[in-house]
Amino acid sequence: PSIDLEKNPEPALQVRRYAYSSKMPIAILTDFEELAIYDTRIKPTPKDTAATARIEYLTLDKYVNHFEDLFNKISWDAVDLGKFNTYYETAKEKRGTATVDNDILQMIEDWRLLLAKDIALHNNEIDEFNLTGCVQKIIDRILFLRIAEDKEIEELFTLQKQIEKGRSDYLYDNLKKLFDLAGAKYNAGLFDSDQFLNALKIQDQTLSSIINALYYPECQYEFSVIPVEILGSIYERFLGKIIRFTRKTKNGHGVEVIEKPEVKKAGGVYYTPTYIVKYIVQQTIGKKIEGKTPAEISSMRFLDPACGSGSFLVGTYQYLLDYHLDYYQEHNLSEAEKTGKIYKDSRTQTYKLSVEEKRRILTNNIYGVDIDAQAVEVTKLSLFLKLLENEGRALGKGGQVDLFRRSDIQQRILPGMSGNIKCGNSLIGSDYYDDKDLLHLGLQEQRKVNVFDWKEAFASILNQGGFDCVIGNPPYVFARDSKEKGMNKEEKEYYYLNYKLAKYQINLYQLFIERSSYLMKEDGIFSFIIPNNWLTINTSIDFRK
């Protein structure tokens, strides 16, 4: 072999970066003559040697004597039977653990505070609400473009090159131009023009430190292999905190980042584990589309009325993508290929859904609502990244479009999702303001309540009978917790007047169930994760009936 796997750190660092970013616990590096097994929960660094985090190392002459041990650990059968996982658990006892999601969460939380401090200090006109939105959008945009680079959809170092340009101009001005080009390319809403963003003053040092943190050697992540589901779990926790002003300064404000009151009361953010999402999706969407053709599925609508960062919608979308690909390969493959629904990847020699088909499925089938504007943007971002998953060069330079050749843009890659993913309070409609006494509510209170009219937002779907499936993990908020979780007296009165299940001590998850029953078709399928106390408590008698 031309590379010494025992001593050369480069192959080890590469495999560890990929595995760590994919949240894989173990990685195997081999050229057959040498074999090394690494614990990839240990974060790689540029200073690591080839031996760092290495659990085992063998050469060809030792394979025979260790054959049984190797077969029991890393053979196909061992992996299939779960013995590989057992080996990982054994190794876990000997070493500390680290996870890519915790690391990235800490990284973007640091960015949030850094950006918030800078913007609040140098932009006297901005308020807390718009500060939060602007910080979120900047982070989303930078992270999206960096992921696109590693997926080879964008040219590598596109973001970092803006720092070099910034030496003769303000870095933020260069980034705004880049965002405009990205908006023309992706059409996702993610890069839409924003008056507050355009007017901001941000110091070059702040932005350059964020961008440089996304590139080697400061960054050890391989963004192309980080699953969208992991990014969703990161953002779910990220959204559990808010930016608050602390003091007035000469030119702006001081800031802090604190937990939302409802998150603090609950003891933290709880992200729905991926395996639970998969199970619920299989038992609802899976049952609903079983045996159906793509044409039949195209008229179906699937909803999460409290979508958060989008875990259930991403899970639903993935299930639909897998189902369609399997269907096309099993039913008239040549026709599906001829009509552009699938294509054969020249590198892997496997069939994939075309971007156009993935766009069609996303816009036809996936719907969500959330009261938190930042959560809505994260849901869209997660769905867009899922659409772009495994695309790579097919969309990058020499492929469909190139970010800096705007005249070459034939079709924007991503669909607009404003008609599918909406921001609002799933439980409170505009009739909340019918009582004249409520007109005293200020802008901040109106933003918190965030009324939402289902009949207006999804008129065509409801006129056709409603959604085919409703799934999710709604908030559990008791009326007795209203002070800490922000449910005001007017909201409680509204619930009592408009929901049959709003009796005694209100719990919002029951109201979500009642609301969902009116949003579904008569033959629709419904599945929520809810606490089991409704089985025994007296206040849930009507709910049990």
Model region roles, listed by residue range:
Residues 2-7, 25-26, 44, 91-95, ...:
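Short, polar/flexible loop-turn hinges at active-site or ligand-entry regions and domain interfaces
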Residues 33, 68-321, 365-378, 424-430, ...:
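Preference for the N-terminal adenyl/adenosyl cofactor-binding alpha/beta module
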Residues 1-3, 100-114, 334-352:
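Acidic/polar, low-complexity linker and loop regions
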Residues 25, 237, 241, 386-389:
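Conserved, well-folded catalytic cores of nucleic-acid-processing
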Residues 15, 158, 221, 246-544:
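SAM-dependent methyltransferase catalytic region
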Residues 1-26, 34-65, 70, 83-87, ...:
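A short, conserved, highly charged catalytic patch centered on acidic carboxylates
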Residues 7-11, 19-20, 135, 139, ...:
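Short, glycine/acidic-rich beta->alpha junctions
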